[in-house]
Curated annotation (Swiss-Prot):
Ranges of residues in domain Tyrosine-protein phosphatase: 27-294
Position of the signal peptide: none
Cross-referenced InterPro entries: Prot-tyrosine_phosphatase-like (IPR029021), Protein-Tyr_Phosphatase (IPR050348), PTP_cat (IPR000242), Tyr_Pase_cat (IPR003595), Tyr_Pase_dom (IPR000387)
Gene3D superfamilies to which the protein is assigned, alphabetical: Protein tyrosine phosphatase superfamily (3.90.190.10)
UniProt record similarity statement: Belongs to the protein-tyrosine phosphatase family.
A GO term, aspect molecular function: protein tyrosine phosphatase activity
Taxonomy of the source species: Viruses, Viruses incertae sedis, Polydnaviriformidae, Bracoviriform, Microplitis demolitor bracovirus
One Pfam family named in its UniProt record: Y_phosphatase
Identification of the protein by name: Tyrosine phosphatase-like protein J1
The species this protein was found in: Microplitis demolitor bracovirus (isolate Webb)
Length: 300
């Protein structure tokens, strides 16, 4: 929704309670329009027989052109169901991926290591309705360690907030001695196929991630505007909740620069980068009202 909100007007009166139902209908129609668009990029690598078992869901392949390509390792190929996603005026701000399977946890950490990821965002529970949605790829107790190949991941500190947890991890490549300090943000109050009950809580989570990312001392290439340490975002399938986080982050950045909430164009662009993502109108609407809450809480 390309909705203008001048910084000189009262943002708190931008959408009144009586207007919300009308806005929801507009957003629903916008989403229907987006879903009618055809995104014709190949997914051949994802659909190869040898790689299908690495996809958590068989109907969720990733595009070939922007997939994360892992280094060839002994006995392993270069495939992971993960996509590079652009941010606002920034190439590859995100890696958007599925929740790891047990057999792809090593691939997950290889992607973290090769792209020097410093912030991981997890928007799923490990189990929901007695089904595994994400393999627990890190240790949930302080001073505990798990090893995948040459990569050792130590849990240093866990801090709990009202609606999310932040875990400080230390990743060490035992072959090279390279060490990465990583912040792992876990938000578990967004059910698969639904939306959180409170936009304020999720907005707090998004802003906490943005603050942590801003503190990482990793440069952006001035020529290509490529982020050299992308934020890795995952849910279970990596198709709705994880892309929704990306959309909200992008819209916040765009609003901060130009005072508009360009939801439609942002989602349309993101669907060209992560296959079949953001297919639910309820989540599209949630993205808008989360960004709107940011607008309302920002001095005009």
């Amino acid at each position: 929704m390309g909705s203008h909100c001048s910084k000189n007007r009262s943002c708190r009166n931008y959408v009144t309670p009586t207007q919300k139902s009308n806005v929801r209908e507009i957003l629903k129609r916008e989403h229907e329009h987006i879903m009618q668009g055809i995104v014709a990029f190949s997914c051949n690598i994802s659909l190869e027989n040898k790689n299908m078992k690495k996809n958590r869901y068989p109907d969720a392949p990733c595009f070939d052109y922007n997939r994360v390509v892992l280094p060839i390792r002994k006995g392993l190929d270069d495939y992971i169901n993960a996509s590079y996603v652009d941010g606002h005026n920034m190439k590859r701000r995100f890696i958007c991926t599925q929740g790891p399977l047990e057999e792809t946890a090593l691939d997950f950490w290889q992607a973290v290591y090769q792209d020097r990821v410093r912030v991981i965002v997890m928007i799923t529970k490990t189990y929901e309705d007695n089904k595994q949605k994400c393999y627990p790829y890190w240790m949930t107790h302080e001073r505990s360690t798990v090893t995948y190949g040459e990569l050792k991941i130590r849990t240093k500190k866990i801090k709990s907030f009202r609606n999310y947890k932040v875990t400080t991890l230390c990743l060490t490549n035992t072959n090279t001695g390279t060490v990465l300090d990583i912040k792992h943000f876990a938000y578990e109050d967004w059910p698969q196929g639904g939306v959180p009950s409170d936009v304020n809580n999720f907005l707090d989570f998004v802003l906490a991630v943005r603050h942590a990312d801003s503190k990482t001392e990793v440069p952006i290439s001035s020529e290509s505007r490529v982020k050299e340490s992308p934020i890795l975002v995952h849910s279970s399938a990596g198709l709705d909740r994880a892309p929704a986080f990306c959309v909200i982050d992008i819209c916040i950045s765009k609003y901060s620069e130009s005072a508009i909430i360009p939801l439609l164009t942002t989602v349309r662009d993101l669907r060209r980068q992560r296959n079949n993502c953001l297919s639910l109108s309820t989540q599209y609407i949630f993205c808008y009202f989360t960004v709107l809450q940011f607008v309302m809480s920002t001095p005009c």
